[in-house]
């Protein structure tokens, strides 16, 4: 019988970022209690030798599974050192990989109080609204003018430590495009 390959998306992440993610998840599971129902599986509870940890986040009938890996082939840069993260959405027997932005939005919808665009309509109708969003990572678009006005009126409260963001976990801060200086500010360009 021939070998059958299963391909999955694994985001290359440096080890310190994975450690920070694990610490934030454990903090919000056990101390702040904001991550109720989340399940953390340690590396020694997994039968797969490359799995470092798994975080299972229930979403009504589905669940989000964020798996961290170690011992993978080294990445393009020396700081990657074979660490990675995969994000999977599971419902029954159906499984699919999702991107970090969508994962953050799903976590945001199901777990954290939000001062969202529906707050505008609720405020106009005289209903009580949540004063702020506890999970800013779940918002990936610019809101309407009314939404921006309401958020300016009620500033979001920063939580210490921050809530675990999947997008922040896989963010590539090393390969962001460099900002170039303007012509007047560049000392090497004009020889001064």
Curated annotation (Swiss-Prot):
Motif (BC-box-like motif): 144-153
Keyword terms of this UniProt record: AIDS, Host cell membrane, Host cytoplasm, Host membrane, Host-virus interaction, Membrane, Metal-binding, Phosphoprotein, RNA-binding, Ubl conjugation, Ubl conjugation pathway, Virion, Zinc
Phosphothreonine modification, residue list: 96, 188
Protein's cellular compartments: Host cytoplasm; Host cell membrane; Virion
Keyword Thylakoid: no
InterPro entries recorded: Vif
Maturation and modification: Processed in virion by the viral protease. Highly phosphorylated on serine and threonine residues.
Induction: Expressed late during infection in a Rev-dependent manner.
Placement of sequence motif HCCH motif: 108-139
Region entry Interaction with host APOBEC3F and APOBEC3G, spans: 54-72
Positions marked as site (Cleavage in virion (by viral protease)): 150-151
Region listing for Interaction with host APOBEC3G, in residue ranges: 40-44
Interaction with host APOBEC3F: annotated span: 14-17, 74-79
Transmembrane feature ranges: none
Region described as RNA-binding: 75-114
Residues modified as Phosphoserine: 144, 165
GO biological process, one term: viral life cycle
Record membrane topology: Peripheral membrane protein
Annotated region described as SOCS box-like, given as residue ranges: 151-180
Subunit text: Homomultimer; in vitro and presumably in vivo. Interacts with viral RNA and Pr55Gag precursor; these interactions mediate Vif incorporation into the virion. Interacts with the viral reverse transcriptase. Forms cullin-5-RING E3 ubiquitin-protein ligase complex (ECS complex) by interacting with host CUL5, RBX2, elongin BC complex (ELOB and ELOC) and CBFB/CBF-beta. Within the ECS complex, Vif interacts directly with host CUL5, ELOC and APOBEC (APOBEC3F and APOBEC3G) substrates.
Similarity remark: Belongs to the primate lentivirus group Vif protein family.
Function field: Counteracts the innate antiviral activity of host APOBEC3F and APOBEC3G by promoting their ubiquitination and degradation. Acts as a substrate recognition component of an E3 ubiquitin-protein ligase complex: mechanistically, Vif hijacks a host cullin-5-RING E3 ubiquitin-protein ligase complex (ECS complex) and the transcription coactivator CBFB/CBF-beta to form an active E3 ubiquitin-protein ligase complex that targets APOBEC3G and APOBEC3F for polyubiquitination, leading to their degradation by the proteasome.
Name the record gives this protein: Virion infectivity factor
């Amino acid at each position: 019988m021939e070998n059958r390959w299963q391909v999955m998306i694994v985001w290359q992440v440096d080890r310190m970022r994975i450690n920070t993610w694990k610490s934030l998840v454990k903090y919000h599971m056990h101390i702040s209690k904001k991550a109720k129902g989340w399940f953390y599986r340690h590396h020694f509870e997994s039968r797969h030798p490359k799995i470092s940890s798994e975080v299972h986040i229930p979403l009504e009938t589905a669940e989000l599974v964020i798996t961290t890996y170690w011992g993978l082939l080294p990445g393009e840069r020396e700081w990657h050192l074979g660490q990675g993260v995969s994000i999977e959405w599971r419902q029954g027997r159906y499984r699919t990989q999702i991107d970090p932005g969508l994962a953050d939005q799903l976590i945001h919808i199901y777990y954290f109080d939000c001062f969202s665009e529906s707050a505008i309509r609720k405020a106009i109708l005289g209903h009580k609204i949540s004063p702020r969003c506890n999970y800013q990572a779940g918002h990936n678009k610019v809101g309407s003018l009314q939404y921006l006005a309401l958020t300016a009126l009620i500033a979001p409260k920063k939580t210490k430590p921050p809530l675990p963001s999947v997008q922040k976990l896989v963010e590539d801060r090393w390969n962001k495009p460099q900002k170039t200086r303007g012509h007047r500010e560049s000392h090497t360009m004009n020889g001064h």
